[in-house]
Curated annotation (Swiss-Prot):
It comes from the Eukaryota. Residues 25-54 bind DNA. This is Uncharacterized transcriptional regulatory protein C25B8.11. CDD domains: fungal_TF_MHR (cd12148), GAL4 (cd00067). PROSITE patterns: ZN2_CY6_FUNGAL_1, ZN2_CY6_FUNGAL_2. Keywords: Cytoplasm, DNA-binding, Metal-binding, Nucleus, Transcription, Transcription regulation, Zinc. Signal peptide: none annotated. InterPro entries: Carb_Metab_Trans_Reg, Transcription_factor_dom_fun, Zn2-C6_fun-type_DNA-bd_sf, Zn2Cys6_DnaBD. SMART domains: Fungal_trans (SM00906), GAL4 (SM00066). Residues 1-23, 63-96 are annotated as: Disordered. Pfam families: Fungal_trans (PF04082), Zn_clus (PF00172). It comes from Schizosaccharomyces pombe (strain 972 / ATCC 24843). GO terms for cellular component: cytosol; nucleus.
Length: 654
């Protein structure tokens, strides 16, 4: 045990044991944990269990009280103490910080403030989105609950949990809303008598597990730094904040960018890997990227999936954010794996209290904003994957009380397109409608009930059509990211209602004209997507919609094949739709892959009894590629051992 105690300096003396309450050891202080020393001369319990040196008996380092800052943003330049990290002292990572220096008080444009150049000598622009050196990444205000890089497990004490919250509230002494006992810390964030909320921060005492976690984190960082150089990393971060973040703002952009500026290892490895993976989608379509992609995106997503499976055992805020990036960009290859990630992310968010209304909590406003955005992003994923997988939802109406996000609710120093942000808000509104549709029409009990009463379901569908039309947005006057995808998602809900009406053969929905108007509008919105749209933000559920639309077009053609008018219209729409899918696929728009494979298999099977469908299939696929349908076959993905990064054989960028 003696090797765990640091020897005091020659000019210092040991601190008296009675000073423990006012000055814990450095490790306990950083972890905000109670420093317990059973006897003088021994290390504290936490350092003993973690097998790390204890500084309790060293002379305390003199602390200079800093001036109060304005809610994480100051007009002063950050001091060296607030910006220095282990990576800053490493020359390998210092270069990145030097090249990302911001012009104080100004927004860095894509053509200034960067000295990094790519392999071909082209300058790599950096869009810091309004971030300057005034922003303090080490400001402790944002992460008082240990949701990010802390070694604590924060979770909400629910009213029925084994911890007696009434006993704790009435008989324990809280100082500034915090009470520490038995190496655990309980923190009040809401003292409301109706819905009090307490967090418990339980130190991570699993020594071997923590060692594995640290080893994995360093290994993944080493892998990323090996295959993604400084200029490429800057480009990928730029692509993410240019193409994804405006319509999907789940990251604290200012804090992330300045953390990345101070060294890529300041960003949790799983979040950085997920962000790089998302950004690779836009590598071919953005003029700021050059050459071949530095990594294979599908292999990167496999790594992220393996990493999430590990990080879920020691979750942080970055774990949820990485999972959300996985859920919006991961190409569908395994429904079970994706459903598992979604379910665990949902439960984890509830464990950390994201389903509560944090408006009156005693936490920084920035954290309130991020919490709301993350919860609604999880809500969106839960509803849409539930719809297309045909599974029960993980989130029910009574499970959350999170208010909607206001259109002017932004973070300090955050600069984003208001139109793109509104597409995110409108998607939340549409997903709320989808929740009611799934709950009222598609639960097991609802399906049983409606099979006996068609009139009831007819009234409900009419009501849902009315609500859908009332929230459908008018045309945006200015172009914005996510607009095309938002139109597709509205079409998807409308088609879902029509398919339900057809399934129950409801008398109020027998007009073929109205049905074809809906389908033609969906195909028209799809055809408006061009090869240049590959740089736009699309929700991943668009791929399911395209596949569903193919099936519906074939069904309509067969249902009306004796009708020269409707049968011919459906056949013409099917022909145009599949050909446009192939055109987009050749331009790198991979959301149509599922629809192409679905159309090929359906036309082949149904062509046995309907030769004209087989002729259509042969004409479409053989005329576009000499390999025929084999050109669109799914390529099996390679699996990797996350503990052996050297086996991940990615080609380095030239």
């Amino acid at each position: 045990m003696s090797n765990l105690i640091l020897t005091p300096s020659n000019n210092g003396t040991e601190r008296p044991y009675r000073s423990r309450k006012t000055r814990p050891c450095d490790n306990c202080r950083l972890r905000k944990s109670r420093c317990v020393v059973e006897s003088i001369g021994n290390p504290c319990l936490l350092c003993t269990q973690l097998k790390i040196p204890c500084t309790y008996h060293l002379p305390p380092i003199k602390r200079n009280k800093q001036k109060k800052q304005q809610d994480s943003v100051s007009d002063d330049t950050p001091s060296e103490a607030t910006t220095t990290t282990n990576d800053d002292r490493d020359p390998k990572y210092n270069a990145l910080g030097n090249n990302l220096d911001a012009v104080r008080g100004k927004v860095i444009s894509p053509t200034q403030g960067s000295d990094a150049r790519g392999p071909d000598g082209r300058q790599v622009p950096l869009n810091l989105a309004g971030i300057t050196e005034m922003y303090h990444t080490s400001d402790d205000k944002f992460d008082k609950l240990g949701l990010d890089d802390s070694l604590n497990y924060p979770y909400v004490l629910g009213p029925t949990c084994d911890s007696d919250i009434d006993l704790i509230r009435e008989y324990f002494s809280f100082e500034n809303g915090v009470c520490s006992f038995d190496n655990m810390t309980v923190k009040y964030v809401s003292t409301s008598s109706k819905s009090p909320v307490m967090y418990i921060l339980d130190p991570a005492y699993e020594n071997d597990r923590h060692s594995d976690f640290s080893r994995y984190d360093h290994a993944l960082h080493d892998l990323l730094s090996t295959y993604i150089d400084e200029a490429t990393g800057r480009t990928l971060v730029n692509l993410y904040f240019s193409h994804v973040h405006p319509s999907y703002p789940i990251l604290h952009g200012p804090r992330f960018l300045l953390s990345y500026k101070n060294g890529s290892r300041n960003v949790p490895s799983i979040l950085l890997a997920a962000l790089y993976s998302v950004a690779l989608t836009y590598w071919p379509s953005d003029s700021r990227s050059f050459g071949a992609p530095p990594l294979d995106q599908r292999k990167m997503w496999t790594i992220v999936e393996e990493g999430l499976n590990f990080h879920f055992t020691q979750p942080r805020l970055s774990t949820i954010q990485a999972a959300l990036l996985y859920l919006i960009s991961r190409p569908l290859h395994n429904m079970y794996s994706l459903s598992s990630i979604l379910s665990r992310t949902t439960v984890l968010s509830q464990l950390l209290g994201f389903n509560h209304d944090c408006t009156e909590w005693k936490i920084p406003n920035e954290e309130k904003t991020i919490r709301k955005r993350i919860w609604w992003a999880i809500f969106i994923a839960d509803k849409w994957y539930s719809m297309y997988f045909g599974l029960a939802t993980n989130i029910h109406e009574d499970d959350f009380v999170v208010p909607k996000i206001e259109s002017d609710e932004s973070l300090p120093l955050e600069i984003t397109s208001s139109h793109s942000f509104k597409t995110f808000l409108k998607m939340i509104e549409l997903s709320s409608l989808l929740q009611d549709i799934l709950q009222d029409l598609f639960t097991v009990r609802a399906l049983t009930r409606h099979s006996k009463n068609n009139r009831s379901i007819s009234y409900q569908i009419i009501g849902f059509f009315t609500r859908l039309n009332s929230i459908r947005p008018v045309e945006f006057t200015e172009p914005a990211l996510g607009v095309a995808s938002l139109k597709i998602q509205f079409d998807a809900v409308e088609i879902l209602l029509w398919k339900t009406a057809l399934r129950f053969n409801l008398p109020d929905f027998q007009s073929a004209d109205d049905l074809f108007v809906c389908v033609e509008k969906s195909v028209s919105n799809f055809v408006q997507i061009t090869a240049n749209s590959s740089g736009d933000f699309f929700w991943p559920y668009a791929g399911f919609h395209f596949s569903t639309l193919v099936s519906l077009l074939i069904r309509l053609h067969l249902d009306f094949h004796t009708n020269n008018t409707y049968g011919a219209r459906a056949f013409s729409l099917l022909d145009a739709f599949v050909r446009h899918c192939i055109t987009l696929h050749e331009a790198g728009f991979d959301f149509v892959e599922m629809a192409i494979r679905r159309s090929s298999s359906l036309l082949k099977e149904l062509g046995k009894d309907h030769p004209h469908l087989l002729a259509l299939r042969d004409d479409i696929f053989n005329s576009n590629d000499s390999r025929g349908e084999e050109a669109y076959n799914h390529v099996p993905e390679q699996l990797f051992d996350p503990w052996n990064p050297h086996s991940w054989t990615f080609p380095k960028s030239d």
